[in-house]
């Protein structure tokens, strides 16, 4: 069965594993998912990310992060730009998620970056997701 929105599937797998407090999860690899996973790791939302090569497209293993009392680090994920309704922003319209507590992941001409980087570089793009 073909998947119409692999980014939404990636976010949903993270959300579901986070809700039941799994240590890790695996998703089929793609360049955009690798970039998103690296952003989540660099921003401190996940513990680690590992790439597994196989004969097909490869697998991304994401290790989730929890606080001292097993509280969730990721409290919410939301897909913004969907295949049926794309959402683009100009450089001066880049959104802030929860006044800077969360991040927006944006696909730009310079690759997949966070909202902070997009504001610093003064570039816009397609808003893929909000994570807080």
From Swiss-Prot:
Xref: Pfam families: Ribosomal_S8
Q: Where are the transmembrane segments?
A: none
Query: What Gene3D superfamilies does the database record attribute to this sequence?
Result: 3.30.1370.30, 3.30.1490.10
What are the alphabetically sorted keywords of the record?
Ribonucleoprotein, Ribosomal protein, RNA-binding, rRNA-binding
Gene Ontology BP terms: translation
Which PROSITE patterns does the entry mention? RIBOSOMAL_S8 (PS00053)
Domain of life, per UniProt, equals Bacteria
Q: Which GO terms describe its molecular function?
A: rRNA binding; structural constituent of ribosome
Any single GO CC term annotated in Swiss-Prot or TrEMBL for this entry:
ribonucleoprotein complex
* Quaternary organization: Part of the 30S ribosomal subunit. Contacts proteins S5 and S12.
**What is known about what this protein does?**
One of the primary rRNA binding proteins, it binds directly to 16S rRNA central domain where it helps coordinate assembly of the platform of the 30S subunit.
The protein, known as: Small ribosomal subunit protein uS8
Organism for this UniProt entry: Pediococcus pentosaceus (strain ATCC 25745 / CCUG 21536 / LMG 10740 / 183-1w)
